[in-house]
């Protein structure tokens, strides 16, 4: 059967992909299979604790993974350990592409997503993996996010209209300029990396809403289609819900989506100042 030759012509000479493919296949043939290559053993020290196991105490357990037979991300290593070494290792994961936020954990000292962080290929270093800090732990790398989700629910993160006569009948129109204001806010995946990196949230998690929830509150405050901006601001007037933010900015540094919760909180504070001025003059 004759080989099919593909050609791509740009501004210069013709590039024949058949030759490139032949070179690629030759390189693959010449390379030694992963099973024959020298093992690249990487150590992972992982936080373990099972509250249902009598007498079990929090500890770090070390596992070894051959990087030649493992995907490039930390989540790949965790899945390999669970599938091939220790099925009792417990962690959350779902999308594997930085969308769902399920695999948020503390990796080598920073809060991030295991599915988007590459394994440190320095074999002399042990990669340390903990659950998100200052949270109750369900088991191993699974934090209890009940309080976090309750706080998110408290801000009513959905569109609210005072005139409900048109609800469900047609779309609420929004200008391109107003829609652009929501960029950098709606992309939040509620992974809790930012909130659990915030010292103010560590100290006052029962009262301070934290950067993730406050950024979502701001997202609805500035939505031109929402009619409850004043009411949303009113709910944040107490000393703790908003004002425990001291612009430490750990939240912005750690966000795996590159968002800026610290800036959103600062904008709420400016809106709050104007809101209080209006309340005094009224």
From Swiss-Prot:
<feature type="binding site">
    <location>
        <position position="251"/>
    </location>
    <ligand>
        <name>[3Fe-4S] cluster</name>
    </ligand>
</feature>
<feature type="binding site">
    <location>
        <position position="255"/>
    </location>
    <ligand>
        <name>[4Fe-4S] cluster</name>
    </ligand>
</feature>
<dbReference type="GO" id="GO:0008177">
    <property type="term" value="F:succinate dehydrogenase (quinone) activity"/>
</dbReference>
<dbReference type="InterPro" id="IPR004489">
    <property type="entry name" value="Succ_DH/fum_Rdtase_Fe-S"/>
</dbReference>
<keyword id="KW-0411">Iron-sulfur</keyword>
<dbReference type="GO" id="GO:0051537">
    <property type="term" value="F:2 iron, 2 sulfur cluster binding"/>
</dbReference>
<feature type="binding site">
    <location>
        <position position="198"/>
    </location>
    <ligand>
        <name>[3Fe-4S] cluster</name>
    </ligand>
</feature>
<feature type="binding site">
    <location>
        <position position="188"/>
    </location>
    <ligand>
        <name>[4Fe-4S] cluster</name>
    </ligand>
</feature>
<feature type="binding site">
    <location>
        <position position="245"/>
    </location>
    <ligand>
        <name>[3Fe-4S] cluster</name>
    </ligand>
</feature>
<keyword id="KW-0408">Iron</keyword>
<keyword id="KW-0816">Tricarboxylic acid cycle</keyword>
<feature type="binding site">
    <location>
        <position position="95"/>
    </location>
    <ligand>
        <name>[2Fe-2S] cluster</name>
    </ligand>
</feature>
<feature type="binding site">
    <location>
        <position position="115"/>
    </location>
    <ligand>
        <name>[2Fe-2S] cluster</name>
    </ligand>
</feature>
<feature type="binding site">
    <location>
        <position position="103"/>
    </location>
    <ligand>
        <name>[2Fe-2S] cluster</name>
    </ligand>
</feature>
<keyword id="KW-0472">Membrane</keyword>
<keyword id="KW-0560">Oxidoreductase</keyword>
<dbReference type="GO" id="GO:0006099">
    <property type="term" value="P:tricarboxylic acid cycle"/>
</dbReference>
<dbReference type="InterPro" id="IPR050573">
    <property type="entry name" value="SDH/FRD_Iron-Sulfur"/>
</dbReference>
<keyword id="KW-0249">Electron transport</keyword>
<dbReference type="Pfam" id="PF13085">
    <property type="entry name" value="Fer2_3"/>
</dbReference>
<keyword id="KW-0004">4Fe-4S</keyword>
<dbReference type="GO" id="GO:0048039">
    <property type="term" value="F:ubiquinone binding"/>
</dbReference>
<comment type="similarity">
    <text>Belongs to the succinate dehydrogenase/fumarate reductase iron-sulfur protein family.</text>
</comment>
<feature type="domain" description="2Fe-2S ferredoxin-type">
    <location>
        <begin position="42"/>
        <end position="135"/>
    </location>
</feature>
<dbReference type="InterPro" id="IPR025192">
    <property type="entry name" value="Succ_DH/fum_Rdtase_N"/>
</dbReference>
<dbReference type="GO" id="GO:0022904">
    <property type="term" value="P:respiratory electron transport chain"/>
</dbReference>
<dbReference type="InterPro" id="IPR001041">
    <property type="entry name" value="2Fe-2S_ferredoxin-type"/>
</dbReference>
<keyword id="KW-0003">3Fe-4S</keyword>
<keyword id="KW-0809">Transit peptide</keyword>
<dbReference type="GO" id="GO:0051539">
    <property type="term" value="F:4 iron, 4 sulfur cluster binding"/>
</dbReference>
<feature type="binding site">
    <location>
        <position position="194"/>
    </location>
    <ligand>
        <name>[4Fe-4S] cluster</name>
    </ligand>
</feature>
<protein>
    <recommendedName>
        <fullName>Succinate dehydrogenase [ubiquinone] iron-sulfur subunit, mitochondrial</fullName>
        <ecNumber>1.3.5.1</ecNumber>
        <ecNumber>1.1.5.-</ecNumber>
    </recommendedName>
</protein>
<keyword id="KW-0479">Metal-binding</keyword>
<dbReference type="GO" id="GO:0046872">
    <property type="term" value="F:metal ion binding"/>
</dbReference>
<dbReference type="InterPro" id="IPR036010">
    <property type="entry name" value="2Fe-2S_ferredoxin-like_sf"/>
</dbReference>
<dbReference type="InterPro" id="IPR012675">
    <property type="entry name" value="Beta-grasp_dom_sf"/>
</dbReference>
<comment type="function">
    <text>Iron-sulfur protein (IP) subunit of the succinate dehydrogenase complex (mitochondrial respiratory chain complex II), responsible for transferring electrons from succinate to ubiquinone (coenzyme Q). SDH also oxidizes malate to the non-canonical enol form of oxaloacetate, enol-oxaloacetate. Enol-oxaloacetate, which is a potent inhibitor of the succinate dehydrogenase activity, is further isomerized into keto-oxaloacetate.</text>
</comment>
<keyword id="KW-0999">Mitochondrion inner membrane</keyword>
<dbReference type="InterPro" id="IPR017900">
    <property type="entry name" value="4Fe4S_Fe_S_CS"/>
</dbReference>
<dbReference type="InterPro" id="IPR009051">
    <property type="entry name" value="Helical_ferredxn"/>
</dbReference>
<dbReference type="InterPro" id="IPR006058">
    <property type="entry name" value="2Fe2S_fd_BS"/>
</dbReference>
<dbReference type="GO" id="GO:0045273">
    <property type="term" value="C:respiratory chain complex II (succinate dehydrogenase)"/>
</dbReference>
């Amino acid at each position: 059967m004759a080989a099919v030759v593909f050609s791509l012509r740009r501004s210069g000479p013709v590039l024949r992909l058949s030759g490139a493919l032949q070179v690629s296949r030759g390189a693959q043939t010449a390379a030694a299979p992963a099973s024959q290559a020298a093992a690249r053993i990487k150590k992972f020290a992982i936080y373990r604790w099972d509250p249902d196991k009598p007498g079990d105490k929090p500890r770090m357990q070390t596992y070894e993974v051959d990087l030649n037979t493992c995907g490039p991300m930390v989540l790949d290593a965790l899945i390999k350990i669970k599938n091939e070494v220790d099925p009792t290792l417990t962690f959350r994961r779902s999308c594997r592409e930085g969308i769902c936020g399920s695999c948020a954990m503390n990796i080598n000292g920073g809060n991030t997503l295991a599915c988007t962080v590459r394994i440190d290929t320095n074999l002399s270093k042990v990669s340390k993996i903990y659950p998100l800090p200052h949270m109750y732990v369900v088991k191993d790398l699974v934090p209890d996010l009940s309080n976090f989700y309750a706080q998110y629910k408290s801000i009513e993160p959905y569109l609210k209209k005072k005139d409900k006569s048109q609800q469900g009948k047609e779309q609420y129109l929004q200008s391109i300029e107003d829609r652009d204001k929501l960029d950098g806010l709606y992309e939040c995946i509620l992974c809790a990396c930012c909130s659990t990196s915030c010292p103010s949230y560590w100290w006052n998690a029962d009262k301070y809403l934290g950067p993730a929830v406050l950024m979502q509150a701001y997202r609805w405050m500035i939505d031109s289609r929402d009619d409850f901006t004043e009411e949303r601001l009113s709910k944040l007037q107490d000393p703790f819900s908003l004002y425990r933010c001291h612009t430490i900015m750990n939240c912005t540094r750690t966000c795996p989506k590159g968002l800026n919760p610290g800036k959103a909180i600062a904008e709420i504070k400016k809106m709050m100042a104007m809101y209080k001025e209006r309340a005094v003059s009224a």
